[in-house]
Amino acid sequence: MDRLMKKLGLLALCTGLSFAVHAVTPQAEAPAEQNVKIDSVVVTGARYASDIRHLPMTVSVVGREKIEQSLQPSLLPTLTEQVPGLFTTARGIMGYGVSDGAAGGISLRGLSGGSGRLMVLIDGHPQYMGLMGHPIADAYQSLMAERVEVLRGPASVLYGSNAMGGVVNIVTRGMREDGVKTYADIGYGSYNTLQTEATNRIRKGRFTSVVSGSYNRTDGHRADMGFEQYGGYAKLGYEISQAWNVRADVNVTHFNASQPGTVTNPMADADQRITRGMTSLSVENNYGRTSGALSLFYNWGRHRINDGYTVDPNDTNNPKDYRFNSRDDMMGVSWYQSARLFRGNRLTVGADYYRFGGEAWNRYVGGDRKGERSDIADKSQDEVAGYVDFRQDIGGWLTFDAGLRVDHHSHIGTEWIPQAGLSFHLPHTIELKASASKGFRYPTIREMYMFPPQNPDLKPERMWNYEVAYSQRLLGGRLTYGINLFYIDGENLIVAVPREGTTPLNMNTGKIDNAGVEAQAAYRISEAWSVAANYSYLHMENPVIAAPEHKLYTEAGFARGRWSVTTGVQYVAGLYTSVKANGRGTENTEDFVLWNLR
């Protein structure tokens, strides 16, 4: 407990000095910005821009203002604070790393991205390691995000496998009004920690561009815990006509991370060199009654990892004479078109094609096999899917929504995924929602073909989520609050089952039986002062590591002109640090409090 408290305390102190420089060409506010409340329009729950009140599922929105106020190079700490039910692990001042000893695990309602049950998207495109099937936490940087939309609950109808527990959709930055805006941020603090970021945005007539770059590094609060990252993001857009536009973007980041092991069992030479990249091209149309898009995307990664060794002289774990290497990629084509066929109606149809995979090998750098290569895996797989979503407003007080996806995997077969929900628009700006939705996940290439306990005969994981949500806006929208109740029933979870006399085997024997409550409230006291809070309680019949039972965050903020101050307190209780596996082992939990002042 004391060690965890010390680590978390360091996060609040890591930035001792921070300042920002802005160069802005003033322009009149765009009409769209005057009339549309940004946090009421989302794209994650419907593919097209949709009023959040008409969605049967729950979507949390974290805007650019919150992202900038957090002064964090990574988006994950901000999401942990602002989104009830979402928790991310951390191991130090900066950086998450990959492989053994990594942090940055994202869990939502007890479903983890590390196990492929939570999907991260960038502008609606899936982002995960092609072989392992999990998100890469250090790739999700604040510099690219205009806002982040978190759909809490299954989103498999729209996004397929890995969206089993929900999605985190990073909506990239743009420029709404003509002009040039440049932003720079530099921070320096404890343990030789440096974080920098610069962004230039331009809009001239029909042309828009965004170019960002960053460099971040730290020595870490322990020996052999250094982290260094540099990367850049660029986005170009052009409005072909009032109805058609095209955009393309590219994001590349490289980081070097070291993993020091535990305090009681430290490690040496556990170093990682990781490069991740993504690029996409989209052509979009919007005719009012109908809108849609055709997009192509390509993600890639190059990993070089030294697993390291324990420094205990009594341990037989000696320096490794090999290095793990991998190349992975994922490409895809997505198309959707949404149309208003008659009054109050919206019909969306779409199709997706994904191809993902890669190769992994060990390269020997010493010993008798020096210079040799030992292959681990070289696999690629395909998914093709079609989906339809039907929405109907009835009498101005009720919205009915139903969707169905048919998803085919080249190795596993076909999966059908339905969902349905109701949204009641009641007097006094009350919104009441009820939904039932199926989520699923195909086994990853790692689970089927890489490392014991691999099993090529695995089946998809499946779950159902049942949810009721209540929310209300008061005082002209200055006060908002909401509460969600959910129950998750899942089966066929992939677990490593021990076998006598041999290695464990991955099998579809696990179950999910989770239930919980999530609540949030925000109050704009005046133009300068605001307060907000969120809380989540999670009951897990089968607990998982890094999923807390209780999470509370409260904050107060003051902003006037160019000056702003925000303070927040996060309380986490019942955070599982170890759980029983197949009836063996012990369950341990820890609690902590983290205070931030920015």
Whereabouts are the PLM-identified features?
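N-terminal Sec signal peptide and the immediately downstream disordered periplasmic leader
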Residues: 1-80, 238, 339, 596
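Extracytoplasmic beta-strand/coil segments of soluble accessory domains associated
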Residues: 77-125
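Short acidic/polar hinge/loop motifs at secondary-structure boundaries
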Residues: 118, 125-152
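Transmembrane beta-barrel wall of Gram-negative outer-membrane proteins
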Residues: 188-217, 222-256, 270-293, 298, ...
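Membrane-embedded beta-barrel scaffold of Gram-negative outer-membrane proteins
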Residues: 206-207, 291-307, 359, 425, ...
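Structural signature of Gram-negative outer-membrane beta-barrels, strongest in the C-terminal barrel
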Residues: 241, 342-346, 372-489, 526-527, ...
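Outer-membrane beta-barrel transmembrane domain signature of Gram-negative proteins
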Residues: 317-401
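Gram-negative outer-membrane beta-barrel transporters
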Residues: 393-397, 487-489, 507-580
